[in-house]
């Protein structure tokens, strides 16, 4: 759907039955303005056009059914009980597997792990360890080839069989726009730059590692974001963890969303600033912390904080939720705080022009003080960037550890980013970038709706390409991953401690490279595995009212 001149890209034409395509009227009723609807255990965060928002904002987090929560705790209890029993049997050398016992020569060594972490790794994680770190031997595109491996010691070690599992549908990579491939203009350009510049720079930007390609990339990133200047880094994680300490320090206050990425958490801790946590995407919680910070100031001295920095993400990679950016910006302006926005997952994946969550909401980039993002996902490359005022970027060039001490970004990687970014911007003379953005949006809505029709509990925003499917029980984490691989579907499964103990999940990442046939194949297998493992917990199954084309459907919501 192309936006009308002077209109909002999210507005859809009205149907004869009163419903709006992919938009304002959903499930047979009109969304109320800026409301939270909680009906029979389902939590909807919905926002109608008007006020701060220029487009509908719909997120769903269905509450865990009570019986499922109880059975999940019972499952962990049984696993813990048998874990202690196995430790007892190992102590008396009755247990056959001795890999979990400590070596005699290391008995007197200082423990490397906390007791519970050690216990959890030995007795719970090892049971399902085969679901992670699976080696692939192909481009991480819509399909991948996986090297088959077997374990003969209960997942403590693996041996390759020599077989290759070919054509596995890839539902786990962050290849949002499909640029992770080995053919096409991006790869040809990167190959030419590799011939001219080589693979590495072997120096920092401060010394002799500042190439003309670095300058070209940073100017392009600034133009793409709509900011005065930008700086690029060779590692996305370090872009957060090494730059936040340069922005804030002792006497400053960081207000961080409780579900922020580990790189943001590490950067906040390294900074030495005081850290306060607000509830995920909860503006009342954030505003209370802002009020308290201004009223009470620093602990003991009651002096005003030197800076107040709000840390949020565009798309939260475990929840599939989108930051309520218009409200965050309104609070930031009201209380004179600074805003640090991590667009690692949202840049390229959201917005009519692929410019991230700022573009998605139709906001002014100047309202965000620090715009951070990575090239590892939508651009099919590596590294990260920070954009903002020229004064900010000049300051970071001399004070950021990642800028001063890190080796410069590889030339062919930079060329991959430059070419893919120009494609997204339409500067390559084609409409490929725009088509990829539109295809990703259609794939996202289609995949989410089909899963909800099947009866799964799905978290997150309806426009988020990150789609968490709730598994809950620990035994179903490993079972789901293995059953999907048997059916040639590669998925990511996640459990405690990466998620709350009763909120284990599978996480699907949609891509513009996925065709309807690929998605339908994956959905068919997910449906079968869902029945096999009894994963269809939702009491709010969506039922299609009309025959469904690929990109537009109306639904009614039924309660089982």
Swiss-Prot record:
GO molecular function list = pyridoxal phosphate binding; serine C-palmitoyltransferase activity
Q: Name one GO biological process term.
A: adipose tissue development
Q: How is its activity regulated?
A: SPT complex catalytic activity is negatively regulated by ORMDL proteins, including ORMDL3, in the presence of ceramides. This mechanism allows to maintain ceramide levels at sufficient concentrations for the production of complex sphingolipids, but which prevents the accumulation of ceramides to levels that trigger apoptosis.
* Documented EC number(s): 2.3.1.50
> Which InterPro entries is this protein grouped with?
Aminotrans_II_pyridoxalP_BS, Aminotransferase_I/II_large, AON_synthase_class-II, PyrdxlP-dep_Trfase, PyrdxlP-dep_Trfase_major, PyrdxlP-dep_Trfase_small
> Principal place where this protein is found?
endoplasmic reticulum
The protein here is known as Serine palmitoyltransferase 2
Quote the gene name from the UniProt entry.
Answer: Sptlc2
């Amino acid at each position: 759907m192309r936006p009308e001149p002077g209109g909002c890209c999210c507005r859809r034409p009205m149907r004869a039955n009163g419903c709006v395509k992919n938009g304002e009227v959903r499930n047979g009723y009109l969304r109320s303005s800026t409301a939270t609807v909680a009906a029979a255990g389902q939590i909807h965060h919905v926002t109608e056009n008007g006020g701060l928002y220029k487009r509908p904002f719909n997120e769903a987090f269905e509450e865990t059914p009570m019986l499922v929560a109880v059975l999940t705790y019972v499952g962990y209890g049984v696993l813990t009980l048998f874990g202690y029993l196995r430790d007892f049997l190992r102590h008396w050398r009755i247990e056959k597997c001795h890999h979990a016992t400590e070596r005699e020569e290391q008995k007197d060594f200082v423990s490397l792990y906390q007791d519970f972490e050690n216990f959890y790794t030995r007795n719970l994680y090892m049971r399902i360890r085969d679901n992670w770190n699976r080696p692939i031997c192909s481009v991480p595109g819509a399909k991948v080839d996986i090297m088959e491996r077997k374990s003969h010691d209960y997942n403590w070690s693996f041996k390759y069989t020599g077989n290759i599992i070919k054509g596995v549908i890839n539902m786990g990579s962050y290849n949002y726009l499909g640029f992770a491939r080995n053919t096409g203009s991006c790869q040809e350009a990167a190959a030419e730059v590799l011939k001219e510049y080589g693979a590495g720079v072997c120096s920092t930007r401060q010394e002799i590692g500042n190439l003309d390609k670095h300058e070209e990339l940073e100017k392009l990133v600034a133009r793409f974001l709509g900011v005065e200047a930008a700086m690029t880094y060779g590692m996305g994680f370090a872009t957060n963890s090494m730059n936040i300490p340069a922005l804030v320090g002792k006497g400053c206050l960081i207000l961080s969303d409780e579900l922020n990425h580990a790189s943001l958490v590490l950067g906040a801790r390294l900074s030495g600033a005081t850290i306060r946590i607000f509830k995920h995407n909860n503006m009342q919680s954030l505003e209370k912390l802002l009020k308290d910070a201004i009223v009470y100031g620093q602990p003991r001295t009651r002096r005003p904080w030197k800076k107040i920095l709000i840390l949020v993400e565009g798309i939260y990679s475990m929840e599939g939720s989108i930051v309520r950016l218009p409200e965050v910006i309104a609070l930031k302006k009201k209380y004179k705080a600074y805003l640090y926005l991590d667009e690692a997952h949202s840049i390229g994946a959201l917005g009519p022009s692929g410019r991230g969550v700022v573009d998605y909401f139709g906001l002014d980039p100047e309202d965000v003080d620090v715009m951070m993002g990575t090239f590892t996902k939508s651009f099919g490359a590596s590294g990260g960037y920070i954009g903002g005022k020229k004064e900010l970027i000049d300051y970071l060039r001399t004070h950021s550890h990642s800028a001063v001490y890190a080796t410069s970004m590889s030339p062919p990687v930079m060329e991959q980013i430059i070419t893919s970014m120009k494609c997204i911007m339409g500067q390559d003379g084609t409409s490929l970038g725009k088509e990829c953005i539109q295809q990703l949006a259609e794939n996202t809505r289609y995949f989410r709706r089909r899963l909800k029709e099947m009866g799964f509990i799905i978290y997150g925003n309806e426009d988020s390409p990150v789609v968490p499917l709730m598994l809950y029980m620990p035994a179903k984490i490993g079972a789901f991953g293995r059953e999907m691989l048997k059916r040639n579907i590669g998925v990511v499964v996640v459990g405690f401690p990466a998620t709350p103990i009763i909120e284990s999940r599978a996480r699907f990442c949609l891509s513009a490279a996925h065709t309807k046939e690929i998605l339908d194949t994956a959905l068919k297998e997910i449906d079968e595995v869902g029945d096999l493992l009894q994963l269809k917990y939702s009491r709010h199954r969506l039922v299609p009212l009309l025959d469904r084309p690929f990109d537009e459907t109306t639904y009614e919501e039924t309660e089982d």
